[in-house]
């Protein structure tokens, strides 16, 4: 049964948000240290036809897997990050403080929580390791297949209680639901659309891609110094795409404040990104399109977007249309408020944790 709802703005939400945040403010310091490791896939074949002799997948985990009488893992949760991010994004207080503590929804003493760095991201294999523009042209299907291999062969996980993905990870969630429909109990995609990337969403990505390729300092990927002009263009695109007008206006109320913040953001972005890694990460979405096979998804889906998301504007009506094709799908559109953060609302768990709770309850066996 599918449903589409628009979350109402409760009068007590600010109080509730404060209570949750205050209650768990010290949780990150109390969490156990995650176990980090690397799984190496040998002769990994990409959809492009290319092969990588060794594909390194970095991961971090909390907790211990629990198995039923048949050896099936019952408590594993896979968290999937966004473009240019890493599994470490889920250690941010606005996520970990709300979900990982004792008695919270993803209590790491109960769940086996897996934070994986995707191909091209974090500490996993990526162009900047040395192959530069000769690195295989990976896409989202390759990334999901490598996640599946990491789980089964690297961690011995044969089933997931939940996949929760944000932004790019949101899109990966749809691919998971179609490619491995029986591997998980539930899906929670946050901040994306289950269709081909087109319109404004494709335009800004194309501008980032062309900005890198057209920069003479990129040198076909064999640069010795980062192409600063290309990265500055990318910084501008990423800032606008991820921005939340209400939050920015509040924090940058004057022209001087806005100018200073802009300069600081570009400086930090350029210093922390590699042009090839960025190009590959953005270009990986080039053939993403789960829409033809949405009916294959058989598990409960809690699909959450926010009304102030520049990348996925609600006025397009795409989410409302496509969720009707998901048998157990439900759409929640979170209205703009003091608590939303544009596209980045996906990591502010206090805003949407009530829907995670409902999903976990609805998908219990």
Predicted regions and their residues:
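N-terminal cap/lid subdomain of alpha/beta-hydrolase-fold enzymes
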Residues: 60-129
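Conserved acidic catalytic loop of the alpha/beta-hydrolase fold
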Residues: 141-162
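Alpha/beta-hydrolase-fold enzymes
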Residues: 183-268
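Conserved alpha/beta-hydrolase "acid-adjacent" motif
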Residues: 310-317
């Amino acid at each position: 049964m599918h449903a589409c709802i628009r979350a109402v703005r409760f009068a007590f939400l600010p109080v509730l948000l404060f209570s949750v945040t205050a209650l768990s403010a010290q949780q990150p310091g109390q969490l156990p240290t995650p176990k980090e490791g690397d799984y190496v896939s040998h002769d990994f074949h990409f959809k492009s036809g290319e092969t990588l002799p060794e594909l390194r997948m970095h991961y971090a985990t909390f907790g211990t897997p629990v198995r039923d009488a048949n050896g099936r893992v019952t408590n594993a949760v896979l968290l999937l990050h966004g473009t240019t991010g890493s599994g470490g994004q889920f250690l941010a207080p606005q996520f970990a403080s709300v979900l990982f503590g004792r008695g919270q929804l993803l209590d790491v003493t109960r769940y086996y929580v897996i934070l994986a760095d995707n191909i091209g991201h974090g500490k996993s294999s990526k162009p900047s390791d040395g192959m530069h523009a000769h690195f295989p042209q990976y896409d989202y299907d390759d990334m999901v297949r490598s996640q599946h291999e990491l789980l089964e062969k690297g961690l011995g996980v044969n089933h997931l209680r939940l996949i929760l993905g944000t932004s790019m990870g949101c899109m990966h969630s749809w691919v998971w639901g179609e490619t491995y429909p029986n591997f998980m109990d539930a899906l929670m995609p946050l901040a994306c659309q289950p269709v081909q990337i087109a319109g404004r969403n494709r335009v800004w990505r194309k501008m980032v891609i062309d900005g890198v390729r057209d920069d003479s300092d990129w040198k076909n990927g064999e640069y010795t110094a980062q192409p600063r002009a290309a990265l500055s263009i990318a910084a501008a695109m990423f800032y606008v795409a991820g921005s939340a007008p209400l939050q920015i206006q509040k924090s940058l109320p004057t022209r001087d404040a806005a100018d200073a913040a802009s300069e600081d953001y570009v400086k930090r972005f350029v210093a922390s990104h590699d042009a090839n890694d960025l190009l590959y990460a953005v270009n990986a979405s080039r053939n993403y399109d789960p829409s033809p096979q949405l009916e294959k998804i058989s598990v409960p889906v809690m699909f959450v977007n926010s009304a102030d998301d520049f990348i996925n504007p609600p006025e397009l009506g795409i989410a409302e249309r496509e969720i009707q094709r998901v048998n157990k799908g439900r759409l929640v559109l979170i209205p703009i408020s003091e608590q939303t953060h544009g596209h980045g609302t996906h990591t502010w768990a206090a805003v949407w944790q009530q829907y995670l709770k409902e999903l976990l309850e609805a998908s219990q066996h």
